[in-house]
């Protein structure tokens, strides 16, 4: 890859670059994508080729890659030039030179176009991420700088995406055209990618010294100072308030390592925030929203300072177009706010703020003392007042300082060092502190509670759902003397428990006694208790204590004594197992930590594809997600063929009784729609065999939430709410059809119950249960309407 440093004098640009007007027989039409206009642009293009073109070639194959690149090349240039004509004729590019006067010489447009086309052949996970990044970068560059190359890049990306989708649907008819639902995990990652890509746009624009945008006068300064330090001193000595003095200082302070690092600080901070967003940190979300608002304000301030006609209507239109990427990022952050609910301990935040305050005081003191003890290093002669007036500017990126008036000017190496690095050092400490804060354990207390619950459960006794109590989102009530605990969630003033109380190893009290103690605690807090998904024996104990019960789910339990699957009843199961053997599909019993990174990614991709086909958001509470698979006590059962293709995966939660594992409960189930059709039946049958080999008596296929057998459903308010919720979820999650499919194994059925005391609170209980499953997502309107209109039932 070769690049010319100065296109005005470069024979490379003259020989290869495309200028307007042009025609189809112009040889430059074919050579415009062969090289780049500057050395820096060539380096950036090389990066894009490594990141996008090389993987695309592996996906498409060499021949198809070459054909696609050629087609993208010959279609995107004419369309891009046509769009550039429209933009210029509408006077929507007022920031820089006429796009039609640009020289087009870059491979970036066909690289992005081919990557967009190849993304259609990627797994859903990477298809969405790749397209999001491509479109965010191209749109930001176009709106921020507005060159002919930017227009062509966006055009090529659109062409590649549309062509790729048409090709994908030609191969697999009936697939989705529009993207489906996102898991909470993927929503976080996609938001982080968007925020990072938007912040990277100005940096990428600054890497090109030929940029023609609203801030080109600032970004060009990064590359070469047009004045000497001596000339700046002369201008400022004559009149320190003159435009010539300020302009000379602006040019000098953009050049060198210090200013380069300072200009990268916003991107560095954004990357740190994006890492926090990917982990769902609420603080990262708040700071990211503030960052977008500050960016928009700074951009508008710069535009106003750089433009003489800021009251003109077309100026307003152009200004709005520049801030569109940040507005989009802000809108996405607001729309996806419910995915960022992981709160960080206020004590950790307070300690971090204290450390940052000390750092700021230290750097501010460094600046003040340097100006006072090194008076000859600055001009004019520094005073305490001038030092304090200049202090705020030391914490701003140099590109922003170009539109501000300075009070002091460095005139020696020591002065330049303090001038450039005072604020940069502070912001680097901010970035490191934020990283530690956002990537560490969010809540020490919550983490300790989960660890204590897991330790007590491993040595004590729980029910078939008890391992779910150590998942995130639960709150714990601890019995005196470590006798046990209750995991619960408070929604709408209702304390919804996750199963029954867990007994400690040395507990001298019964579950009924612990339940009574917890109810007293909840009553003191002003909550109403609803015991959710408890077994029949515990529900009878609550009836004796004055509760009412409602059957809410059916658990299917398989005996390991049937691991041979003999008899006519198990014909379908034997068929699934025989077919798996015939197709070379085998099972692996393992944990998440023991899987390779590649297999972990396959599981994540399979889960994302499963969720994308659902209209409802991913749920939680008693329904595990990929996040819960990493638990070291949770076992995974995978169906893999000889080519390492993942056909399906199930996860199994341990069930403890008096300190030992007595069985496992099925949680996550995912299958490849294009893979082995009977994979779930195969995996469940393999789980029964594993139970027998581990001397376990049973394996629970769990309960299908909100699916009750005919004749036992409740007709009252809460029954109607749960029935409607279950019916609405059925097409997307298949709980009821799943309950029917489990009958192939002829399991024992056990009811799970909801126990409640106050019948008047039934509507609130129904909505609270729904809120637990939907987590932070809003409840459907039809569900709220049912709760408020249906009559109560005793």
Curated annotation (Swiss-Prot):
Locations listed in the record: Cell membrane
Keywords: Cell membrane, Membrane, Transmembrane, Transmembrane helix
Gene Ontology MF annotations: aminoacyltransferase activity
The keyword Membrane belongs to this UniProt entry's keyword annotation: yes
Broad class of the protein's primary localization: membrane
Stretches that traverse the bilayer: 34-54, 67-87, 99-119, 132-152, 257-277, 283-303, 315-335, 353-373, 421-441
Domain of life: Bacteria
A Gene Ontology cellular-component term: plasma membrane
Membrane topology label: Multi-pass membrane protein
GO process annotations (BP): phospholipid homeostasis
Protein known as: Uncharacterized protein Cgl0966/cg1103
Lineage: Bacteria, Bacillati, Actinomycetota, Actinomycetes, Mycobacteriales
